[in-house]
A protein has these predicted regions:
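Conserved glycine-rich cofactor-binding loop
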Residues: 13-14
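C-terminal helical subdomain
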Residues: 167-170, 174, 191-231
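Residue(s) in the substrate-gating loop at a strand-loop-helix junction
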Residues: 133
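Conserved glycine-rich Rossmann-like NAD(P)H-binding loop of the short-chain dehydrogenase/reductase
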Residues: 27-43
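Substrate-binding pocket helix/loop in short-chain dehydrogenase/reductase
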Residues: 89-90, 97-102
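Rossmann-fold cofactor-recognition segment
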Residues: 46-59
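Active-site helix of classical SDR
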Residues: 113, 150
Length: 231
């Protein structure tokens, strides 16, 4: 078993997930990266990095956890970053749209944490980061309404994990960013990228949250690139 802490990160091939992986690697973490098409990142040390072919829409969380444990013997943190957005209003959308987003944004991270719950508890300070969204705190527009339904649920999921694991040393945080300079954001807004939060900045936030002690628990962490009434 490795003596270094081990983090499982979903959606790790690009954007926020890749930035988080890079940040944690620089801090000495061992990584298990969930990717639809596994490719070893340039910054990664192969001996300290496990790649798992993983698509949140298809499941396979229990197998991923099993493979990571077989490779490294422990799991200290889960970063549930994989997510999708279908930009439709609650009126225009079909059930299939909602089902697709719930499958990736809510059900998949729940299954991943469920599968890793015992090894997280075994560390005495397991950490769970649910990448939610400011859309999990307010509904900003008509076309974000359906997405917001799933992100409100993702925030609730994080709170549920926190309640279930707190006595075991598990701490869960819902990280709620606004626009981040990623492919997803570029596809839905004409906001200049230089005015968005950078993935590397969000990675700094996640690393800070994971590094806090058990007596400094943060339930939610909102990050905005613009002035809003509450964020």
């Amino acid at each position: 078993m490795t003596s270094a802490p081990v983090a499982l990160i979903s959606g790790a091939s690009r954007g926020i997930g890749l930035a988080i992986a890079s940040k944690l690697a620089s801090q000495g973490w061992v990584l298990s990266l969930g990717m639809r098409t596994p490719v070893m990142p340039a910054f990664a040390e192969p001996a300290r990095t496990h790649l798992e072919r993983y698509d949140a829409a298809e499941g396979g969380e229990a197998e991923w956890v099993e493979h990571a444990l077989a490779r490294f013997g422990r799991i200290d943190a889960i970063v549930a970053n994989a997510g999708i957005m279908i930009p439709k209003s609650v009126i225009d959308a079909e059930d299939e749209d909602l089902d697709a987003m719930f499958a990736v944004n809510v059900k998949a991270p729940r299954r991943l944490v469920k599968a890793a719950f015992e090894p997280l508890a075994a560390t005495g300070r397991g950490r769970v980061i649910i990448l939610a969204s400011l859309s999990g705190k307010r509904v900003k527009s008509s076309d974000s309404g359906l997405y917001a339904m799933t992100k409100f649920a993702a925030v609730a999921l994080s709170h549920g994990i926190r309640q279930s694991g707190y006595h075991l040393g598990i701490r869960a945080t819902a990280v709620c960013p606004g626009f981040v300079g990623t492919d997803m954001a570029r596809a839905i807004t004409d906001r200049p990228e230089e005015t968005m939060t950078r993935p590397e900045e969000l990675a700094d936030v996640v690393a800070m949250l994971i590094g806090l002690s058990n007596t400094a628990s943060v339930a939610e962490f909102a990050v905005s690139c613009a002035l809003e009434e509450s964020y």
